[in-house]
Amino acid sequence: MQDLIRASLVIALLSGCTASPMLKYSLDVPAQTMSVLDAPEVQDGRARFREIFCSTLHEHPDRKRRGCDELLHRLRDEAPSAPQPGPPPAPDHRLRLVFVTGLFNDCASTVALPFETAVAHLRSLGYSAEILSVSGRSSSSYNAASIAEIVSQAPDGDQRLVLVGYSKGAVDILEFMVAYPDLAKRVSAVVSVAGAINGSPVADVAAPFYQRSLKDVSLPGCGPGDGGALASLARPARLNWLVTNRLPNARYFSLVSFTRPDTVSSPLRPFAAALAEIDPRNDGQLLFYDQVIPGATLLGYVNADHWAVAVPIEEKRPVLATLVTGHNWFPRDMLAEAIALYLSEQLAAEQDTR
């Protein structure tokens, strides 16, 4: 009888009959990813990226608002910072950084586009940078064609093309890399920022409703596309795609975002709470271990939610940021600069070893 009672208690616990999520928010864990069998090994670039990001932050006018160690999470297994950080890399102005937008971003383009202010900042530093606003309501295969068109127009020469994908934009880039292998050879590096690499449980729940009720509904600022955006982000779709598709040779880098539940933007809080039933280390759209490209170099864990890491609502629409979203401040321009500097160093080192 006692064994039956114990078994019933265990079943009740595992069935979700708890007052709060079983996992607690904590940084006392190592870096981790979830991927498919035989996936390429992820490399750890956190220590050097932290050095570069912290050095760029010294140039930010609001650097005292939050310290560098508060902006980048330090998980249990990250190597301690060196007493004397290495010298900052020399910027490689041959880089051409193309930032690919994510889910529904074109629908909100009048508010702000991902890395909109960062692109202007990078240009002021001498880099070539631009935003590719893909169809926010379309499937990743649909948007891969748009990326292919941009890449096909890239001039020959010593320019180094870097594709930076935010959220679903990262997935669109990966589909491009596989579907257009000849064009993919022109890409020097791929960077995911809060990339939906493994998909999201949020999409698993929302995709059927969207397909039934919203797929063909007109929305301001964006056409319906092929209607497959959320279906592309479902976890079965993404994980099965990773099983059947090997990424071509290129350098891959991933920057992950997550933050505490109380620092999530207000509209994202219901999603963050739902995801916390799986793991509280999420950004309001994605779990932290779902954001790393197989075989990528892990750059770090940004202490920001899914919008704050990339979308400059505070800069572009300060009233909206204050009254509606909240918690949107983040030095995105410095983050983009640190990415460019890190790539400058890494791609130069790769060239030297050839």
Predicted features and spans:
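C-terminal catalytic-base region of ester-bond hydrolases, centering on the histidine
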Residues: 24, 36, 43, 248-354
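Active-site catalytic motif of lipid deacylating hydrolases and related acyltransferases
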Residues: 88-161
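Short aromatic-enriched loop/helix-cap "lid" or pocket-rim segments at secondary-structure transitions
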Residues: 111, 200-206, 263-268
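Flexible, membrane-associating and regulatory peripheral segments of lipid-active enzymes
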Residues: 17-110, 353-354
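Glycine-rich His-Gly loop
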Residues: 100-103, 167, 195, 257
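Sec-dependent signal peptide recognition
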Residues: 2-10
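Serine-dependent carboxylesterase/thioesterase catalytic core
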Residues: 145-244
